[in-house]
């Protein structure tokens, strides 16, 4: 496969991921295939977002890091000091991706680091590792294109998370806004009773204790459920099981208490 074909394959990752959840393991696999190297996508805080192995390294510490999906803090912080592509670092480099306790085994292990940038911010690092053959210019071009694509996907994922949070908050505010004063009072007592995100509620007990009718509680729950904020299920004489579906509900209720 020539350089142009490999570049097109990397760029197709963007088209494929449009409208879908970002899969950094799949992206790592594509980069690993076209560059023929072990590939790791690491966030700025050291979280391993995705990886693909081209050449196996039999090392328990590396296996543990891959299982935990996290690199050591000291190593991760060190990566942030690398602000441009650094190619063909040997096993004596503090940035080597090969296990330092096996230096003699991986004497011909080469590491390349490519900063992942987006929106003017450092988002993470693309790490490539290869045994025997050094990385050449074509590999570095592909790595930098790959890092750009990964950066765009990280930004898209962040943007979607922010949008989802705003949507969740708006839904909760609308649901709370639809409640009457007595229904809102009932809701506050309901979640004080639950002491968490889910639990069993006996409406008649709350109604008697607070001095409101049972129908007010039922109406309040119905409004929240129709908004998709909670889920409720009648358990007959035992009461009603309630589960919070929107994580913004409890903080918003807490805010109302203190305002």
Curated annotation (Swiss-Prot):
One of the record's GO molecular function terms: DNA-binding transcription factor activity
Location of the DNA-binding region in this protein: 203-222
InterPro entries found in the cross-reference section: CodY, GAF-like_dom_sf, GTP_trans_reg_CodY_C, Transc_reg_CodY_N, WH-like_DNA-bd_sf, WH_DNA-bd_sf
Listed SUPFAM superfamilies: Winged helix' DNA-binding domain
Keyword Cytoplasm annotated: yes
GO cellular component, one term: cytoplasm
Disulfide bond residue pairs: none
Record-level GO BP terms: negative regulation of DNA-templated transcription
Keywords: Cytoplasm, DNA-binding, Repressor, Transcription, Transcription regulation
Compartments where found: Cytoplasm
Residue segments, region GAF domain: 1-155
Function: DNA-binding global transcriptional regulator which is involved in the adaptive response to starvation and acts by directly or indirectly controlling the expression of numerous genes in response to nutrient availability. During rapid exponential growth, CodY is highly active and represses genes whose products allow adaptation to nutrient depletion.
Membership in a protein family: Belongs to the CodY family.
Name of the featured protein: Global transcriptional regulator CodY
Organism of provenance: Brevibacillus brevis (strain 47 / JCM 6285 / NBRC 100599)
Designated gene of the protein: codY
């Amino acid at each position: 496969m020539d350089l142009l074909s490999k570049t097109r394959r990397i760029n197709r990752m963007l088209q494929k991921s449009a409208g879908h959840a970002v899969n950094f393991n799949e992206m790592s696999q594509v980069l690993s295939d076209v560059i023929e190297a072990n590939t790791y996508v690491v966030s700025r805080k050291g979280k391993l977002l995705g990886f693909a192995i081209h050449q196996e390294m039999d090392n328990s510490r590396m296996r543990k890091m891959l299982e935990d999906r996290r690199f050591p803090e000291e190593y991760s912080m060190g990566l942030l000091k690398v602000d441009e592509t650094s190619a063909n670092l040997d096993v004596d480099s503090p940035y080597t991706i090969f296990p330092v306790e096996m230096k003699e085994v991986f004497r011909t292990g080469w590491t390349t680091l490519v900063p992942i940038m987006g929106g003017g911010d450092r988002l993470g690092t693309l790490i490539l590792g290869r045994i025997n053959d050094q990385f050449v210019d074509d590999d570095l071009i592909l790595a930098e294109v790959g890092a750009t694509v990964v950066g765009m996907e990280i930004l898209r994922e962040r943007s979607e998370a922010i949008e989802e949070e705003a949507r969740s908050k708006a839904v909760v505010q609308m649901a709370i806004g639809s409640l009457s004063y007595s229904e809102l009072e009932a809701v506050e007592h309901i979640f004080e009773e639950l002491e968490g995100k889910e639990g069993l509620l006996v409406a008649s007990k709350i109604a008697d204790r607070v001095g409101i009718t049972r129908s007010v509680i039922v109406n309040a729950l119905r409004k929240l459920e129709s908004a998709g904020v909670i889920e409720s299920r009648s358990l007959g004489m035992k009461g009603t099981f309630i589960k919070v579906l929107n994580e913004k509900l409890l903080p918003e209720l807490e805010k109302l208490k203190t305002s």
